[in-house]
From Swiss-Prot:
Gene3D superfamilies: 3.10.20.10, Cytidine Deaminase, domain 2
Compartment(s) of residence: Cytoplasm
Entry-linked PANTHER family: FORMATE DEHYDROGENASE, SULFUR CARRIER PROTEIN FDHD
Keywords of this entry: Cytoplasm, Molybdenum cofactor biosynthesis
Name used for this protein in its record: Sulfur carrier protein FdhD
Length: 276
């Protein structure tokens, strides 16, 4: 379906999204040590030849990012409205995701298009007015359930999608958990919103339906908004939820759970989907 190109090829066995640098450590200032660090690069999403947004992101799983961002921002309603994705690396370290939309979707995008430059996973940068921040979301149906007895098992698997994080300690993760608590897949990124977008793109492409999203970060309003727009009914976060995240989750009937730790969880909204 997608024509994915890349101007950057990595040798077999090299983990995408990491590089090395010399560092000095406390009590050993006279010694240089080689350490791994996570790459962070500008990624431009270009729709039908027109630049829409530049985000700072990890340079991996970019096809999933293109799909997930397009879905979670309401640019498309189905991945099938994307005709092609070209991933083009530029000489200065930036990357362009050249996305070709259907004519109908591109016409809709042009009506509300704005140029914005995001910091690491920041979704509010560049909004022209407050009404641009909160998109209308239809209330979610109640078709999913999740047993909190499976939460510890789910948490134990999340780091398996963080190859870069294991080397650098520098990434967030988002995963899709089935009702039995098994991690079906996930993505990592230096930005928590980008990690979620990548995972939502993976979910769309693989066709996962039953389950919940598990993120390694806090639950901000945008994490809730993106999840709800993509039809996710249950969002599990390792850290806390913000007041606005709770408000939006309640309004759109999303089950929001924070402080997901071994043996612990705080349920903020719509506990009726949860089985204890």
């Amino acid at each position: 379906m997608y024509n994915v190109k890349s101007g950057k090829l990595l040798p077999f066995g090299v983990i995408e999204g990491v590089t090395r640098t010399n560092v000095q450590q406390k009590h050993h200032f006279d010694t240089l040590k080689v350490d791994w660090i996570a790459e962070e690069v500008p990624v431009a999403l270009v729709y039908n030849g027109i630049s829409h947004v530049v985000m700072m992101a990890s340079p991996k799983d970019l096809e999933y990012f293109a799909i997930g961002f397009s879905l979670s921002e309401g640019i498309i309603e189905s991945q099938h409205e994307i005709r092609s994705i070209d991933i083009v690396a530029h000489c200065r370290g930036g990357i362009e995701l050249q996305i070709e939309l259907s004519s109908r979707r591109f016409a809709g995008l042009k009506e509300r298009r704005r140029n914005l430059a995001g910091r690491t996973g920041c979704g509010i940068c560049g909004a022209e007015q407050l009404s641009d921040i909160f998109r209308p979301i239809s209330p979610l149906p109640f078709t999913q359930t999740f047993s909190l007895n499976q939460l510890d098992y789910a948490l134990s698997q999340l780091t398996s999608v963080q190859d870069v994080g294991a080397l650098t300690g520098c990434t967030h993760a988002a995963g899709w958990i089935n009702p039995e608590g098994k991690l079906l897949g996930g993505c990592e990124d230096v930005g928590r919103h980008v990690a979620l977008d990548k995972m939502l793109g993976m979910k769309a492409k693989t066709g996962w339906q039953q389950g919940a999203v598990l993120v390694s970060s806090r639950a901000s309003y945008e994490m809730v908004q993106k999840s709800a727009i993509c039809g996710v009914e249950i969002l599990l976060a390792v850290s806390a939820a913000t007041s606005l995240a709770v408000e939006i989750a309640d309004r759109c009937h999303l089950t929001l759970v924070g402080f997901c730790k071994p043996g612990k969880a705080t349920i903020y909204t719509h506990a009726e989907r949860l089985i204890s």
